[in-house]
């Protein structure tokens, strides 16, 4: 049995662990996508709590199975809440997942991202490839990176089959240096823990046309890691999101609908997907 076959065979068990454990996922995220993140976590069988007041975050994360911190809409109070909760999570070995939304577009986002990376142990970092390459530049892995289009990926960075190996090399080196799992999401997702690197060629081109698809994925990553382990949990989360996107697009096309319906159907299929469907629909490659 190949390593790929072994990974695929574990998917139903990993997904069942998420649903049976119902991991409490503490998300400190942005007000643009908070509702979608909570519903995505619920849809896969986990439980969200969206606490960010500095007076309670240490207590909340103490009962959580994972902490997801998302810098999409920064404030001084929210950054302080992220630091307090990350410190407490590290103290009790609760996994911390970082979504460095828009890192590279401002000095504040760069500063906060580096402070989190340097001071707290992270189980995973999930971002688009421009965000991941920006972190690679900030940490000395590469010398240059493109500037993001706001919080969206730079068009010149978009992952394709032509640049897959080049991007995978950067992601693997960054994962090894930071001792964490890195997931760069896009038309092709790449994830690595520095030793094993996986490409996932699933998803749909409609996904970037709704706000929050990346934030939802990061929250799902937190839930899956909270019930399993960083590399395999991140892989299952990426498969859930991308395959739900494919199915949502098919449903939208059958109804001649648009992005509003796509957003709703995405949540529907996150709820409906099972392990065998993930195996059947997955298009993964171990690089």
Curated annotation (Swiss-Prot):
One of its GO terms (biological process) is thiamine diphosphate biosynthetic process. Signal peptide: none annotated. Its EC number is 2.7.1.50. Disulfide bonds: none annotated. ATP binds at residues 126, 185. InterPro entries: Hyethyz_kinase (IPR000417), Ribokinase-like (IPR029056). CDD domains: THZ_kinase (cd01170). It catalyses: 5-(2-hydroxyethyl)-4-methylthiazole + ATP = 4-methyl-5-(2-phosphooxyethyl)-thiazole + ADP + H(+). Keywords: ATP-binding, Kinase, Magnesium, Metal-binding, Nucleotide-binding, Thiamine biosynthesis, Transferase. Coiled coil: none annotated. Substrate binds at residues 50, 212. Its cofactor is Mg(2+). One of its GO terms (molecular function) is magnesium ion binding. Pathway: Cofactor biosynthesis; thiamine diphosphate biosynthesis; 4-methyl-5-(2-phosphoethyl)-thiazole from 5-(2-hydroxyethyl)-4-methylthiazole: step 1/1. Catalyzes the phosphorylation of the hydroxyl group of 4-methyl-5-beta-hydroxyethylthiazole (THZ). Belongs to the Thz kinase family. This is Hydroxyethylthiazole kinase. It comes from Methanobrevibacter smithii (strain ATCC 35061 / DSM 861 / OCM 144 / PS). The gene is thiM.
